[in-house]
Amino acid sequence: MKSPVLVWLGFSAMCLGMFVAILDIQVVASALTNIGVSLDIADDSLSWIQTGYLTAEVIAIPLTGLLTRAFTLRWMFVAATVGFTLASVGCALCDSGAALITIRVVQGLFGGMLIPPVFTSVFILIPKERQLIATTVAGAVAMIAPWSARSSAAI
């Protein structure tokens, strides 16, 4: 039996990962104009920064179940977190539009792998009598992330 404190701590960390992945979508959407000016990206190419990320994320979400079965929930989530973090650093270091679009696709793949494990963990780790609370927390985190993005993009 796992310690309830460790289970909730792990669940909270997973919620934070999901929050950042969802937040990233909205923050970048808010900053697209500034990104385009900074990197001298044409308007028709600028949309690919978001499109590449979102397409990769949508592809990664259903693959997460397969990856979880192959590598376990813990290791898949850790790998996704490390990959997302490294891709985020890569995005910050990009000096061209093509490089940014490419790294955003990679970031989207890892970002997509940060969302489903939160809800999977509710049914695997959380005791049945606490699953409603955990699902509510996860849903609230998923809803608060895009809402809070506008103010964090301004920073």
Where are the regions that the model predicts?
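Extracytoplasmic
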Residues: 6-64
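Helix-loop-helix hairpins in multi-pass membrane proteins, especially solute transporters
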Residues: 61-155
